């Protein structure tokens, strides 16, 4: 419903239905984690991944949503991308549809406030914005997060801290980490996407030619099974230099 929305108002109405489910999931996670740090990555996959591709499945979903088959089929077609790995996903979704980031922030902060009040635990939400390649992207989404989070925390009358960080998974992000660090309180290196974008091939498609690369001694092993020290590792090292004012560095494999 949210994906098929034609206006901001329709999208916000659909997101309002999703929010309680996200909040419930986050509350369950915070209860399990206690005061241990937990990082929540905001919506990353392209939207087409949430829709069916087979006609019979589209027909069934259209009936459930009260749409015609043709209308839903057109939505699916409109979301098609030639290279979805580098397409409309990650922070780009939040820039295009800031109401998504606002909803996720409400779910995260409300969950943290509720579980903190219920258990007495000091919970510090760590919110991670994915696929940032330009500091202004991060600032745009961070402004949405901070506005929503600060309003909820003030309304609750508590002094809950939270952090906003990002994934370093685009080569440009690694090269401009010093600038991005001005808006991020932590980094997590997304080694899967960073490897894909540095090598220039998709993990899903590489099997078609990697066998020949092994046979011809071009690669000794799958670049996705270990961190490439010479190329990808160099980008990580450049991004993690000592003069960054970053509180926490991590990796997502």
Cite the ranges covered by each PLM segment.
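Conserved alpha/beta-domain cores
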Residues: 1-253
